[in-house]
Amino acid sequence: MTKNVASPTEERMAYLEGLVRQAKTAAAVFTQYTQEDVDRIVKAVVLAGLDHAQPLARLAIEETRIGVLEDKVIKNMVATEFVYNYIRDKATVGTIREFPERGLVEVAEPIGVIFSLIPITNPTSTVLFKCIMAIKTRNAVIFSPHPSAWRCSAEAVRIMYETALKHGAPEGVFSCLEAHTLEDNAYLMRHKDVALIDATGGRGAVKAAYSSGKPALGVGPGNTPVYLEKTADVSMAVVDIIVSKTFDNGTICASEQTVVIDDEIYDATLKKFVELGAHICSEKEAEVLGRTLVDRQTGCLQPIAVGQKAINIARVAGLTVKPDTKLLIAPIHGVGPEHPLSVEKLCPVLAVYRAKSADEALRVCVDVNHAGGLGHTAVVFSRNQEIIRRFGDLINAGRIIVNAPGSIGALGGVYNDMV
């Protein structure tokens, strides 16, 4: 993203410098705020985001044509109310911890100006969340929305900014790039006064953030492996997977991507999927689906499939399915470029693999994990504590979800406390 990208014009640089200067001033003023000041503003912006959860979700659907309205409302609620309940009593100003036995105190200091990339899949909830966290930590943010979701993201920024100002936040604490380009992003990532890059998006965005030479937080693609082990409650697992994988049409990067199923319960599991509205692809259908949905050169899902309904994806691929089909399930026999559906699929398409043993199942889950989801999310359904521990030891993921839906479990606040 920053490599081989031309510099902005002089006029554009003046605009970008103005945004940075404004944010830098706001961040400097913010350092003088007390915990009481911060918490007052946080509560106000949380309530504003919550009040606008539905209209922002509707605006996102209208602009991007991605996802499910009701689920985007829930995302906005999680990003505001759920997050607030988790952080409301946390100290973020001045001395926050003391270690008298070591003669140490921990003092919270803001980092300054944050440059933040916003994805098309979660264009409003991500803004709401980042605004709340910025206020709580006394930082200023320059937002760079996805070009195809600029209107809804910019509206979310406007709502949070105006509310924050009304309740005493410094002027310029939030801003949003207008009609921006890759050149703008590259310029701001390299800017000496930008202290942190917060990139939520695709591989390119995250790679650019980490290649900038600055501190960066990258939230990129997940390729969530799921192990459905023979001792699991199959009915519960299938319901959880369908709920999770169809939530917002599969746009959460923690959603299930490949389910590795023990041989002993494979047939019963697929039967339950069909009972609950899934379509099991034949070998030929799976091949067509993979060829249609995944770009062979990049190994990424084609944009036309992101966040679309299963029946619409089936239509594009030329598959005949029932009109009430919720999920497309494609059997695969390996992981890697020769098995295109083993990659991340931000849509209601799920790969399944039949494993002859626990060792094989765990190996395939590791392969899926390494095929594009390192450090992200993994799920295991089992009553066997030894299997659960082995899974956790082998898989490189920041979140190991046990006997719960991947996407909703990773959001936190519902099935666990991982907010």
Give residue spans per PLM region:
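ALDH superfamily catalytic-core signature
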Residues: 3, 10-13, 206-336
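Rossmann-like NAD(P) dinucleotide-binding subdomain of oxidoreductase/dehydrogenase enzymes
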Residues: 95-236
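Conserved C-terminal structural/oligomerization subdomain of aldehyde/semialdehyde dehydrogenase
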Residues: 5-8, 31, 319-419
